[in-house]
Amino acid sequence: MKFTVEREHLLKPLQQVSGPLGGRPTLPILGNLLLQVADGTLSLTGTDLEMEMVARVTLSQPHEPGATTVPARKFFDICRGLPEGAEIAVQLEGDRMLVRSGRSRFSLSTLPAADFPNLDDWQSEVEFTLPQATMKRLIESTQFSMAHQDVRYYLNGMLFETEGSELRTVATDGHRLAVCSMPLEASLPSHSVIVPRKGVIELMRMLDGGENPLRVQIGSNNIRAHVGDFIFTSKLVDGRFPDYRRVLPKNPDKHLEAGCDILKQAFARAAILSNEKFRGVRLYVSENQLKITANNPEQEEAEEILDVSYGGTEMEIGFNVSYVLDVLNALKCETVRIMLTDSVSSVQIEDAASQSAAYVVMPMRL
């Protein structure tokens, strides 16, 4: 195996394929990248057995086919440490891979390519193409609600659901729920899968905001995404995700509307004096007015009074202020609509001008 490539053509692919690699690999070869040269292309692959990222680099200079695996971190650090515009010549000699550039020379240990694990072949059941911006919006709108190391393992991920000509993402940790739907050009069969948390983060990392469309394939145990020269595959979480439709409040009869930024700033200020552990704030809603209060064990108090649009009956309700702020940060809109029922029912929060995303937050007894 032999190839020569410019540093700039290698850096981004190396960074992307190193993404799935954890801190301390369980098997030594999982800390390595698979390098394969064939048909004028260099393929780089990184995996942690749960997911895999493949990058392709076109080789314009003379090369010889072959394959090997090298320590990912060291190879990336060497390439990154070389000066801009450097040409990198790589050659496999016995069980060593030689890397040369200018007057620098490195000899890396290798492990056989045949030992590198690859995800089993699988059949795709649903396929569709969408703009990168659409996928980015779907993930950004819901990502923060995923659970973190919950024993209900199926919550440590994101539900991707196709229905008609819509793609939907849902995430919940049992205290709050986020759902976002975006239209697709094609009509698709109804299908839903749970992508693990780490897979969602990697999928987000591969979106470069460019014009290249994203092609998605979903099988019974895997999801694959192609964009440009990158192919990402992740195993799915086996489990039953809660039905978000049953979590949305049934018929909230009280609607409050207010400016998103004004609300965000008021909640952020009140949060300073909320209990550091429980993060509780109280909301008092009356005609066209919202009062937010917070206090802590040191008997310190915060009070914010805002003019809002509200015509329902007076009520008070408590929330974890962090959950509300997460929603307001994700909404990025001008006016927010908050739909309330009573002090013990969850509320629904959405952009007043668009129904594409909805957020549900459970109340807190204060």
Swiss-Prot record:
Gene: dnaN
Protein family (similarity comment): Belongs to the beta sliding clamp family.
The entry's keywords: Cytoplasm, DNA replication, DNA-binding, DNA-directed DNA polymerase, Nucleotidyltransferase, Transferase
Keyword Cytoplasm among record annotations: yes
Gene Ontology biological-process entries: DNA strand elongation involved in DNA replication
Organism (species): Salmonella typhimurium (strain LT2 / SGSC1412 / ATCC 700720)
Subunit and interaction comment: Forms a ring-shaped head-to-tail homodimer around DNA which binds and tethers DNA polymerases and other proteins to the DNA. The DNA replisome complex has a single clamp-loading complex (3 tau and 1 each of delta, delta', psi and chi subunits) which binds 3 Pol III cores (1 core on the leading strand and 2 on the lagging strand) each with a beta sliding clamp dimer. Additional proteins in the replisome are other copies of gamma, psi and chi, Ssb, DNA helicase and RNA primase.
Subcellular location: Cytoplasm
Name assigned to this protein: Beta sliding clamp
GO molecular function annotations of the record: 3'-5' exonuclease activity; DNA binding; DNA-directed DNA polymerase activity
Record function comment: Confers DNA tethering and processivity to DNA polymerases and other proteins. Acts as a clamp, forming a ring around DNA (a reaction catalyzed by the clamp-loading complex) which diffuses in an ATP-independent manner freely and bidirectionally along dsDNA. Initially characterized for its ability to contact the catalytic subunit of DNA polymerase III (Pol III), a complex, multichain enzyme responsible for most of the replicative synthesis in bacteria; Pol III exhibits 3'-5' exonuclease proofreading activity.
Cellular component aspect of the GO annotation: cytoplasm; DNA polymerase III complex
Pfam families to which the protein is assigned, alphabetical: DNA_pol3_beta, DNA_pol3_beta_2, DNA_pol3_beta_3
InterPro entries: DNA_clamp_sf (IPR046938), DNA_polIII_beta (IPR001001), DNA_polIII_beta_C (IPR022635), DNA_polIII_beta_cen (IPR022637), DNA_polIII_beta_N (IPR022634)
SMART domains the record matches: POL3Bc (SM00480)
UniProt keyword annotation of Nucleotidyltransferase present: yes
